[in-house]
Amino acid sequence: MNTEIVQKHRVLTKGNPNVTFIKVSIGKRNFLAYIDTGATLCFGKRKISNNWEILKQPKEIIIADKSKHYIREAISNVFLKIENKEFLIPIIYLHDSGLDLIIGNNFLKLYQPFIQRLETIELRWKNLNNPKESQMISTKILTKNEVLKLSFEKIHICLEKYLFFKTIEEQLEEVCSEHPLDETKNKNGLLIEIRLKDPLQEINVTNRIPYTIRDVQEFKEECEDLLKKGLIRESQSPHSAPAFYVENHNEIKRGKRRMVINYKKMNEATIGDSYKLPRKDFILEKIKGSLWFSSLDAKSGYYQLRLHENTKPLTAFSCPPQKHYEWNVLSFGLKQAPSIYQRFMDQSLKGLEHICLAYIDDILIFTKGSKEQHVNDVRIVLQRIKEKGIIISKKKSKLIQQEIEYLGLKIQGNGEIDLSPHTQEKILQFPDELEDRKQIQRFLGCINYIANEGFFKNLALERKHLQKKISVKNPWKWDTIDTKMVQSIKGKIQSLPKLYNASIQDFLIVETDASQHSWSGCLRALPKGKQKIGLDEFGIPTADLCTGSSSASSDNSPAEIDKCHSASKQDTHVASKIKKLENELLLCKYVSGTFTDTETRYPIAELEVLAGVKVLEKWRIDLLQTRFLLRTDSKYFAGFCRYNIKTDYRNGRLIRWQLRLQAYQPYVELIKSENNPFADTLTREWSKPSSS
């Protein structure tokens, strides 16, 4: 029996004729409160509130069995409803007696006279806003059977939920195995074919790798294991690629080196597969507004796809001691492997795109509704996985989460996005003094990954300094300035902002800026902003607001364009609404970049326009489907957005830029430079200010 029911049962049967339970509510939750006239204080379980505070000094209490207890947490000024009338409890102490809430004399004396009758109790209710207003309130005392019935109903509901969720665990177990070719579960039936461009060509790369005794022993053990599992077989293929071991940070962390096969020559000789992997921004767009997540990881995903007999010889590899093997399954290192596996997963999950997606072997299930709805979605996906014969790793599966790590990001149900600790760790493990050009490339690759997700505020100019060192035309030299640059970047990695993945109900604000050498942008969102401002789901005003119009002019000079910056009534309406709600705006992402040598020769006014074009196109997946507010401190750019450039060969690039901008429908707000700190600091932190 549940401990809570046991405790209530003891209270009800200990022989006390004055045992009194009543129904009360705190916030939106209902509880059974035990009226204890022998208690001097009020006590409650942790579940009655989320606002417990630690006491400065522990409070000693003595309970009915004369034992001492120390209370360390309490909540103050709790509003409690009895018969829909609000009462104030000055303080409730945290103590788990097995009962949800114990109401003691400190409360009863506040609302005396307290009268207990055979079937009811009465208290004097006082209006908290007008203490002179009061009345006697009567509420029913619950009988022993009623209390136990309510308690058992609660346990029954909990049991139903437990059994409901338990079926998910059982369903997951049905598709899990430690062997990717488990014949009882892997029934996909596919045979993968890879073809040579020239069917008669032999790709035999001489293996000149010097192996250590450790290498020989590990190859022997690993290949015997792969043979036993049926993943490889001994080969007589004319083709061969050398195998070797790598031991990077991840391998050191897990305590096992990773075997790698150099298929470079084979990849050059075979026909590729152009099936695309989903973009990260597409994935984030798809899961917008989701509250619940589950992630499933295919067990050694590539190894679940069997190779056609004609393809197996192409995967042959050599390793010590004088061994020649070929794969029975899809191997890592083949250029076609990611596309082949992505196609397999997309086809397997076809029709379920509204609740799940796959990035190679990582499956993400997402739900915008309730927890129960998400559980149902998980069951549907698991059933499909079983039908398609996909094997899942139980160890890596995470079910029914409101926060989940996926593709290097930590995604939360409230729309918040953070960089996963694992991704941060990979960057911080680089030394402050990078050893060579290859290490700089790897370092910048990791940094670019973070920048592409929108976390890094001013990467463009910091990155440019290190990028120059990659070129072999420049003599290799590393000095203290370079070290400080790396340290600066690593320092910023440790204090990156949290980002917000805006949903369709949110209103977006884009801020752009440019200097002579770089451009930048900042995307922010007003949660549920379209409703707050008075816009429909596409960002169009629901009320009749006059719209501005733009027409072609014979004069395309900056002065003429400046005249056109006067905002339409719609622009003014939206901008004024946003200004009042400025404190509610959430950061979505940053972007920055540098202009080419040719572009740096453009007039600064035109660079402001080009910066806007680059920023909007970078975030096209967010901005094409809705209207948004575009903020700029350039009069020229503000006018450019409302002004039709006259077709003229002298204005070629301006016309091209305007054609690119026609895909977007922004509300335009001209702001002062000091009011554009987000984008402005990105371009000017490392360059001299330029007036526009």
Swiss-Prot record:
Tell me which family the UniProt entry assigns to this protein: Belongs to the caulimoviridae enzymatic polyprotein family.
For this UniProt entry, the molecular function terms from Gene Ontology, in alphabetical order, are:
aspartic-type endopeptidase activity; endonuclease activity; RNA-directed DNA polymerase activity
Catalytic center residues: 36 (for protease activity)
The organism encoding this protein is Soybean chlorotic mottle virus
CDD domains noted in UniProt: retropepsin_like, RT_LTR
Q: What GO biological process terms does the UniProt entry carry, in alphabetical order?
A: proteolysis
For this entry, the protein name equals Enzymatic polyprotein
Q: Does the keyword Hydrolase apply?
A: yes
Highest taxon listed in the record's lineage: Viruses
Q: Does the keyword rRNA-binding apply?
A: no
Q: Keywords for this entry?
A: Aspartyl protease, Endonuclease, Hydrolase, Nuclease, Nucleotidyltransferase, Protease, RNA-directed DNA polymerase, Transferase
